[in-house]
Curated annotation (Swiss-Prot):
Mg(2+) 1 binds at D251, E263. The keyword Manganese applies. This is D-alanine--D-alanine ligase. One of its GO terms (biological process) is cell wall organization. It is an enzyme of class 6 (ligase).
Length: 302
């Protein structure tokens, strides 16, 4: 009898559309692999969510949610209470990785290079007392580059100055690192490869990630062998330091001398053309095989 797998998708974060794509693609790949698949669009009604899982009682939950409440430990905590094995990282690793200041502390503890940064309220940023330009302003707990702004000497209109800016009073202010964008998928405790991301946008923002033609993925990244190896080593170390499991994706900047860890994504995109599945395929692992591995290694912290 095939395992019953419920795929969590959608949600109510700013990354809902991305999650719907990930869930649909993962669900289809799991069906191809022989699993009995149920797709569950997760909403704010927690009681309805618990009831749906209680009724179907899957053997494994495939978490294809992105953004707040899906990859920040909230859903993971509910699944732990219900004693349902689920894919990807547990609640603590998810919560730490999603909160940028907490993740930076972990990286620094393990001697993983990070850009100079500070947590500041928006008023101090607007008063130009937080950090000298150029710098990057990031919401503390959003993914997919949502709300990210690069502030240079030429920047006048600051979106986080508006009263309707929805991402909180405090922000992460980080020194802007010029250079190349690299990303490394980690599967278990092994790096899948290194990809260079090339875009005509100022940086790898939401549109560059998801709009047609917004970016190009170069696999493997055309960097020196020692840079390639170090990117993989730092990404595996970050995965382990945070306590991640399943797959994760580390994003780095390379300025020609130093690799800087930007963040680790515990719920990377899961379409067959997303970065981690793309790297897995280059390493000889098909998309159905990748999602199968995630299901077969699923855990919970009950």
């Amino acid at each position: 009898m095939s395992k019953r797998v419920t795929v969590l998708m959608g949600g109510f974060s700013t990354e809902r559309a991305v999650s719907l794509n990930s869930g649909a693609a993962a669900g289809e790949a799991l069906r191809q692999a022989g699993y009995a698949v149920t797709l569950l669009d997760v909403g704010r009604d927690v009681a309805a969510f618990i009831a749906a899982l209680t009724q179907t009682r899957p053997d494994v939950v495939f978490n294809a949610l992105h953004g707040r409440f899906g990859e920040d430990g909230a859903i993971q905590g509910i699944l732990d209470i219900m004693a349902l094995p689920y894919t990807h990282s547990g609640r603590l690793a998810s919560a730490i990785a999603m909160d940028k200041p907490s993740a930076k502390l972990v990286f620094e503890r393990f001697a993983i290079p990070v850009a100079p940064h500070v947590v500041a309220d928006r008023a101090s940023v607007l008063a130009e007392t937080a950090m000298a330009r150029p710098y990057v302003v990031k919401p503390l707990d959003q993914g997919s580059s949502v709300g990210v702004t690069i502030v240079t000497s030429e920047t006048n209109d600051l979106p986080f100055s508006r009263d309707d800016w929805p991402y909180g009073r405090q922000v992460m202010v980080e020194r802007f690192i010029p250079g190349r964008e690299l990303t490394v998928g980690v599967m278990g405790d092994k790096a899948l490869g290194v990809t260079e991301i090339v875009t005509d946008h100022r940086f790898y923002d939401y549109d560059a990630k998801y709009a047609q033609g917004g970016s190009r993925h170069i696999v493997p990244a055309p960097v020196a062998p020692e840079v390639f190896a170090q990117a993989q080593e730092l990404s595996v170390l970050a995965h382990q330091a945070l306590g991640c499991r399943g797959v994760s994706r580390a994003d780095l900047r390379f300025d020609g001398e130093t690799l800087y860890m930007l963040e680790v994504n515990t719920q990377p995109g899961m379409t067959d053309t997303s970065l981690v599945p793309e790297q897995a395929l280059h390493a000889g692992i098909s998309f159905p095989d990748l999602v199968t591995w995630l299901v077969e290694t699923a855990q919970c912290d009950a």
